[in-house]
Amino acid sequence: MSILEVKNLSHGFGDRAIFEDVSFRLLKGEHIGLVGANGEGKSTFMSIVTGKMLPDEGKVEWSKYVTAGYLDQHSVLAERQSVRDVLRTAFDELFKAEARINDLYMEMAEDGADVDALMEEVGELQDRLESRDFYTLDAKIDEVARALGVMDFGMDTDVTSLSGGQRTKVLLAKLLLEKPDILLLDEPTNYLDAEHIDWLKRYLQNYENAFVLISHDIPFLNDVINIVYHVENQQLTRYSGDYYQFQEVYAMKKSQLEAAYERQQKEIADLKDFVARNKARVATRNMAMSRQKKLDKMDIIELQSEKPKPSFDFKPARTPGRFIFQTKNLQIGYDLPLTKPLNLTFERNQKVAIIGANGIGKTTLLKSLLGIISPIAGEVERGDYLELGYFEQEVEGGNRQTPLEAVWNAFPALNQAEVRAALARCGLTTKHIESQIQVLSGGEQAKVRFCLLMNRENNVLVLDEPTNHLDVDAKDELKRALKEYRGSILMVCHDPDFYEGWIDQIWDFNNLT
């Protein structure tokens, strides 16, 4: 029996169709991977099934009494709450039951109280609390918080002071503690370190309820799912098995369709040739008409146009001085120092990856080196002739510009055709280029920012988690481009598969604090 069913769903933004008459079902206990290229509509689908967005057409039907939890990285956390306070809200229902028990005991003390009936209700509530391990909740909260790295930044920390990555960890921990019938997870590993990803993988493998997962971390995705829904060309197609099995079946179906297309095209050409040669001759006119009828009744096989794949190419600028950045007793932070005094040297043509737990100051270090924020103590010496290109991890939402406008405003000397060509090289279609940036997916928005970076000459690239939100093709192409780039790279990255093999040096931020 389906616990979630989507029927005849159609949706779009303006004249850009996202889904066209698609259906979807989720059965109890299924572990579904929702896969597809950037911009195909995966996050939009999640927003529709959770009711955050209304579809243009179609129905979303949930079974009665089913609970669902959605990892929404834009959720608002109440001010003046500690991390522990937020995690304890996962059990609000149980705390209400405890309060009700206390009220019932108060009622028993009143004259004329039906003690037997009140005790029966107390017993039912007590059974519910014990079945949910209510009296060991704090231990359970600590277990999940430790496993996801939440304890690294403190359970008593005010949530309003958290970084984006820390905030996402808290939301994920709260969601897992709630243990709903259906988990809806959109890129849950984006801000997790390797050890936390391993724990989440084991957790999801053993999760007895259902979940729908979006992730561009293919090894992680493959290890936890048993059903794939592929989003492509406004359609949703269901496949049984893990991601690698889906790839095999998809490639085989694509190959079979292409072979059938080629055979049909040859048959069409032969039929048209026969009709053209024989329709005018009396002796063969009937045969020509028969062939024409066959042509007219033929169901034409259509191949979907290939999705544009990005082609990244970062232009080097003139050669800088030997030293890019040198720090002297640098301490970074906002109110309190996040690091011990740092004496770092970053030289010309080095390619360095900065790794370490989320929320401990890697982004703050980049911004301090660039002069975006002032250090608490010490100094940063920047080299001569620097042409810096900076890719930020987080950008503010609500950008009503189109990619065409954003790039053209940044490079007014280009004509419209050149701007469109530059965006197309980053894997964006005409529909993407003419849509507002705020309605694009995270991966598409990243491609717009890469386009801005590519059209400047830089001799230093400073990149903060550049692979977040990128699909497999875009990530592979970015890796190739950075490997071939003839300049210096300083990059924060949590994905060893991305940087291993071409990075010269690793700065482990855990050793700098």
Feature locations, PLM:
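Post-kinase regulatory C-tail/linker adjacent to protein kinase catalytic domains
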Residues: 312-314
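ABC ATP-binding cassette signature C-motif
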Residues: 1-259, 308, 317-513
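Intracellular alpha-helical coupling/juxtamembrane segments of multi-pass membrane proteins
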Residues: 249-304
